[in-house]
């Protein structure tokens, strides 16, 4: 962090974006594979304020869980898993991310807060 770049991509360690880490970012986008990139959810609030686009990790990394969940459901119902259905759902990830960013901009809430709310609504909690 602190190096000028287009995309900061945390891919190994979680909680790298704490108050100090966010302040040191010199990028336009944060998008990576590490789980729990934000040390605390409120650290995500500072990203849009600084003009940094944040892609919540569990959204952009959803392909694996989509595949596993469909395999599980197919087994539970004694049906073969259709790889085309998996691919179709994975192909929706960019659209979902766009929805998150649009709602974030519209509502003033951070992308992480918006993504969490959408996830809770989808799973019924």
Task: Give the ranges of each region predicted by the language model.
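C-terminal amphipathic alpha-helical segment
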Residues: 1-7, 53
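Adenosine-phosphate binding glycine-rich loop
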Residues: 28-125
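Rossmann-fold NAD(P) dinucleotide-binding segment
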Residues: 1-3, 14-30
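A general structural motif
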Residues: 9-16, 34-39
């Amino acid at each position: 962090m602190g190096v000028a770049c287009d995309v900061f991509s945390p891919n190994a360690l979680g909680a790298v974006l704490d108050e100090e880490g966010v302040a040191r970012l010199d990028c336009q986008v944060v998008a990576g594979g590490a789980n729990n990139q934000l040390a605390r959810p409120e650290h995500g609030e500072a990203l849009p304020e600084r003009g940094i686009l944040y892609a919540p990790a569990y959204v952009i990394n959803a392909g694996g869980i989509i595949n596993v969940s469909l395999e599980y459901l197919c087994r539970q119902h004694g049906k073969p898993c259709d790889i085309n259905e998996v691919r179709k759902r994975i192909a929706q990830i960019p659209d979902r991310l766009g929805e998150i960013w649009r709602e974030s901009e519209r509502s003033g809430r951070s992308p992480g807060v918006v993504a969490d709310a959408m996830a809770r609504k989808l799973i019924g909690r």
